[in-house]
Amino acid sequence: MEIQNDQWVSAFLLYLKMEKNHSPHTIVNYELDLRHFRDFMEQQSIPSFAAVSYAFVRHYLTVLYEQEYARSTVSRKLSTLRSFYQFLVREKWVMENPFLLAHTPKGVKKLPSFLYEEEMEQLLDALNGDSPLQLRNRALFETIYASGLRVSECCGLKLQDVDLSIGTVFVFGKGRKERYVPIGSFACDAIQEYIENGREKLLKKSKSVDLPGDLFLNYRGGPLTERGVRKILHQALDQAALSTRVSPHSLRHSFATHLLNNGADLRVVQDLLGHENLSTTQVYTHVTKDRLRDVYRTHHPRA
């Protein structure tokens, strides 16, 4: 049974990669959720995925809540297992999907964190200097704010993906989907200065035989990582004397929020962000409504 379980998981992960075009990061998360469920099965003496019943699924969810897992985490695990069993049913390895009727209670949707326009200006203004790392940091955050790229997308940019003559970047995004995103003159200027006066100096520190073609490099001349971007942002927030604690992804939220605040069409923002569904983008309309309400209460004499 152990061998069969391993084979089914491997087949599912291959399906996610080859047919669903999921990113390696997403596939790893699926694998971790499946491993967690298998560990629970072993604790409960359930020998195989085929032996899982709806009653066992309810027991599993109850234990997750008793262990105080976040609602979002439970929801993600449930989604993973529902998709896994849907695949097993498709392959005719099991007769039915025990997760089909399992649901988590709906919670209050958390609004995305973002910086106000004044805070964003304060952050970017603090990124001055002409050292290679300072030039890189300025170009990095100007690019994310100008384009709304995910941090993973920004770290994945190659030199040839950026066309400064027309102000666009080519993005290989989530689900292996490709899109072109415009960037403004501030980002173009920052990238140009970084390429001319910073990147080559960082590249010389690389000990690799095959020099990376990545646009953004770390202090050793290798590709900049998402973890590295988080560290740089925290340092930049301190440098800008901003007490707001936000993540690099919050700059993407800021991009979308500021566009909508200034009258951009929701579907245009959807395309720029690379969202497959409009409902994913609509969360930003709640943010802008809150912003409008704050402005009204602050400035209207009879608010």
UniProtKB/Swiss-Prot annotation:
Cross-referenced Pfam families: Phage_int_SAM_1, Phage_integrase
SUPFAM superfamilies: DNA breaking-rejoining enzymes
GO cellular component: cytoplasm
Active site (catalytic residues): 150, 174, 249, 252, 275, 284
Top-rank taxon: Bacteria
Subunit structure: Forms a cyclic heterotetrameric complex composed of two molecules of XerC and two molecules of XerD.
Protein name, as recorded: Tyrosine recombinase XerC
Organism: Halalkalibacterium halodurans (strain ATCC BAA-125 / DSM 18197 / FERM 7344 / JCM 9153 / C-125) (Bacillus halodurans)
